[in-house]
């Protein structure tokens, strides 16, 4: 039993960027992910759409395993997961892998929370900094946006404008401090 708990903690530490600890950010990000995965915009994510999205992210999942996991969350009569089903699946996965770590709020005054937040930001930065040089170039940003299936990745001019909007020192690329500043100043609409 102790070994199982240690394994969960180890997985949680290695994959801390998966955990979405702030409830308002969690809901916003989860809705955005749902919208990205719902390719035809019908309000449902089919097993096939989920499989395609995971493949684009480099997470090749066995279709039969995915089907057996996901189908139990699909309501009778629906063609796929609606947002509530998707949220339930996410919560179950979070509880299974991370002990429900995404449900709680963040305490900015807590030094360990601040360190985790910094670590999460560093992991997110590495996703975009594909060559590991410490900067996000327009080409790297475009590559990631395309992998995610986002239309913004289709036009380099649009990607360059995104870079310019956060590039405070005007060197044509985003460093980690500019990335952190951008992530911390994202405005989340209140409901």
From Swiss-Prot:
Please list the residues that bind Ca(2+) 3. Answer: 167, 169, 171, 173, 178
- What sequence ranges are listed for the domain EF-hand? 25-60, 116-151, 154-189
Q: State the InterPro entries in the record.
A: EF-hand-dom_pair (IPR011992), EF_Hand_1_Ca_BS (IPR018247), EF_hand_dom (IPR002048), EF_hand_pair_protein_CML-like (IPR039647)
Binding site residues for Ca(2+) 2: 129, 131, 133, 140
The protein's UniProt keywords, in alphabetical order, are:
Calcium, Metal-binding, Repeat
On whether rRNA processing is a keyword of this UniProt record, the answer is no
Q: Which GO terms describe its molecular function?
A: calcium ion binding
Tell me, which GO biological process terms does this entry list?
trichome branching
Task: Name the residues that bind Ca(2+) 1.
Answer: 38, 40, 42, 49
What's the domain of life for this entry? Eukaryota
**Role noted for this protein:** Probable calcium sensor that binds calcium in vitro. Involved in the regulation of trichome branching.
Can you name this protein? Answer: Calcium-binding protein CML42
Q: Which gene encodes it?
A: CML42
């Amino acid at each position: 039993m102790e070994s199982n708990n240690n394994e969960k903690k180890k997985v949680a530490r290695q994959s801390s960027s998966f955990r979405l600890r702030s409830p308002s950010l969690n809901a916003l990000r989860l809705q955005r992910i749902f919208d990205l995965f719902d390719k035809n915009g019908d309000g449902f994510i089919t097993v096939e759409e989920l499989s395609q999205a995971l493949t684009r992210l480099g997470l090749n999942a066995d279709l039969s395993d995915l089907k057996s996991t996901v189908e139990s969350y699909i309501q009778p009569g629906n063609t796929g997961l609606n947002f509530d089903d998707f949220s339930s699946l996410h919560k179950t996965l979070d509880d299974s892998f991370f002990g429900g770590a995404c449900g709680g709020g963040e305490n900015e005054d807590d030094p360990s929370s601040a360190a985790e937040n910094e670590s999460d930001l560093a992991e997110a930065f590495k996703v975009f900094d594909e060559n590991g040089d410490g900067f996000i170039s327009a080409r790297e940003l475009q590559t990631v946006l395309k992998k995610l299936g986002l239309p913004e990745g289709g036009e380099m001019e649009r990607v360059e404008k995104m870079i310019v909007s956060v590039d405070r020192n005007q060197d044509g690329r985003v460093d980690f401090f500019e990335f952190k500043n951008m992530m911390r100043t994202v405005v989340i609409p209140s409901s």
